[in-house]
Curated annotation (Swiss-Prot):
It is an enzyme of class 1 (oxidoreductase). The gene is CAT. This is Catalase. One of its GO terms (molecular function) is heme binding. Keywords: Cytoplasm, Heme, Hydrogen peroxide, Iron, Metal-binding, Oxidoreductase, Peroxidase, Peroxisome.
Length: 492
């Protein structure tokens, strides 16, 4: 008997029903009872196994990005950037790398409507020859807070009230009134882009600054941008209500049906490049995640294209168990000093261990598609076959050795050990610039959203005044229009 042939896979299904241990099941409808009326006997092993498996089917949902959909495809380099990075998957035009991509909403539960106003996740896992590279981003280029110390509170404020389980504006406005840097993200959150028509018609951003390093060890800061070839489309509030009431999975269905029909979604990848020597030349901190880089000074440079041409085979195995981690990088790519990114490196791996288990990287959807070797061993649900006698390094009995060193950016850091904010906060300028770039009807929708939120009966006069002050500092006319509709005067 070829024992390796029958590893767990639907490819080796038997023609008849069996237990988990492979024993035949001749009746899948009736429990084993004493007579036709019962009682049920505990010795009905298949009944117990079936029920026990059923009640353990679900794993903890993601604390954020619980609602999502995935698809597979490839990334192809279209423009040479080998002068910027030694990353193998970016080595030359024409190089293709298999990927899996997951789109999601951020705040709400796994079964919530995909039409709800929310930031969308846009995460791409590149299965490169040098290991996995996870670019874990969103459909907006900034985030609410620049320091991860506030991240748990940020998500709790956005999530439903723990008493009533209802999302309420007064909670959101109360918390973020203490974070003036959040206004720039609200200029996206309350804008049309947080009601995307579907996943195919939205942009993606790496959000954080990263570093690309070339063979000579020269590093540049970069930001990643995904641009959909079919354009960006959004819904109005009324359209979102109608779509959500018709089909709460409309974006998942659109993605799945489009790929099945051969209408493959495609995005172009662009980068912005900044020389580290230029970081202090701006009136904001370029490593502040609440800021964007000006495209007139740092223009978008084309890199490649992402094509999703294959639907996943199993939603649970390749969406629910799919695990991303910003800590997964490859030679030629490195982190920046962005405070939020630095913390995500730990938090994402930790949440996957809690959600899926300590050996989540052994799952096929998460495992690298290249040869790999380490001495991380055993643990719950370990299913990796190992027959080594040496489980330590270094050893004269094991030929494994450390990998050849690849370039990483050198950095000399000095400073006091302290808890503090960055010196160049500049919290309102970019929010105002974004507002002024819109057509009048788009500005009006943004103002209406603020009026709706600030009209929450539990939003106090103090909270309203703070937000009108923030809006006025971003754009005086915007703050005045919101104030006039609320009959609240700005307090500057």
């Amino acid at each position: 008997m070829d024992l390796s042939k029958y590893r767990p896979s639907s490819a080796y299904d038997s023609p008849f029903l069996t237990t988990n241990a492979g024993g035949p099941v001749y009746n899948n409808v009736s429990s084993l009872t004493v007579g036709p009326r019962g009682p049920v006997l505990l010795e009905d092993y298949h009944l117990i196994e079936k029920l026990a498996t059923f009640v353990r089917e679900r794993i903890p949902e993601r604390v954020v990005h619980a609602r999502g959909a995935s698809a597979k495809g490839f990334f192809e380099v279209t423009h040479d950037i080998s002068h910027l990075t030694c990353a193998d998957f970016l080595r030359a035009p024409g190089v293709q790398t298999p990927v899996i991509c997951r789109f999601s909403t951020v705040v709400h539960e796994r079964g919530s409507p995909e039409s709800i106003r929310d930031i969308r996740g846009f995460a791409v896992k590149f299965y490169t020859r040098e290991g996995n590279f996870d670019l874990v981003g969103n459909n907006v280029p900034v985030f609410f807070n620049r320091d991860a110390k506030s991240f748990p509170d940020t998500i709790r404020a956005l999530k439903p009230n723990p008493k009533s389980h209802i999302q309420e504006n007064w909670r959101i406005l109360d918390f973020f009134s203490f974070l003036p840097e959040s206004l720039h993200t609200f200029a996206f959150f309350y804008d049309d882009v947080c009601l995307p028509t579907d996943y195919r018609h939205m942009e993606g951003f790496g959000v954080h600054a990263y570093q690309l390093i070339n063979k000579a060890g020269k590093a540049h800061y970069v930001k990643f941008h995904w641009k959909p070839t079919c354009g960006v489309k959004s819904m109005t509030e009324e359209e979102a209500i109608r779509v959500g009431g018709t089909n709460h999975s409309h974006a998942t269905k659109d993605l799945y049906d489009s790929i099945a029909a051969g209408n493959y979604p495609e995005w172009k990848l662009f980068i912005q490049i900044m020389n580290p020597e230029d970081v202090d030349k701006f009136d904001f901190d370029p490593l502040d995640v609440t800021k964007t880089w000006p495209e007139d000074i740092l223009p978008l440079m084309p890199v490649g294209r992402l094509v999703l041409n294959r639907n996943i085979d199993n939603f649970f195995a390749e969406n629910e168990q799919l695990a991303f981690n910003p800590g997964h990088i490859v030679p030629g790519v490195y982190y920046s000093e962005d405070k939020l990114l630095q913390t995500r490196i730990f938090a994402y791996a930790d949440t996957q261990r809690h959600r899926i288990g300590p050996n989540y990287m052994q799952l096929p959807v998460n495992a690298p598609k290249c040869a790999h070797h380490n001495n991380h061993r055993d643990g719950a649900m370990n299913f990796m076959h190992r027959d080594e006698e040496v489980d330590y390094l270094p050893s004269r009995f094991d030929p494994c050795r450390p990998a050849e060193q690849y370039p990483i950016p050198s950095c000399v850091l000095t400073g006091r050990r302290e808890k503090c904010v960055i010196p160049k906060e500049n919290n309102f300028k970019q929010a105002g610039e974004r507002y002024r770039s819109w057509a009048p009807d788009r500005q009006d929708r943004y103002i209406n959203k603020w009026v709706e939120s600030l009209s929450d009966p539990r939003a106090t006069h103090e909270i309203r005044s703070i937000w009108i002050s923030y809006l006025s500092q971003a754009d005086k006319s915007c703050g005045q229009k919101v104030a006039s509709r609320l009959t609240v005067k700005p307090t500057m």
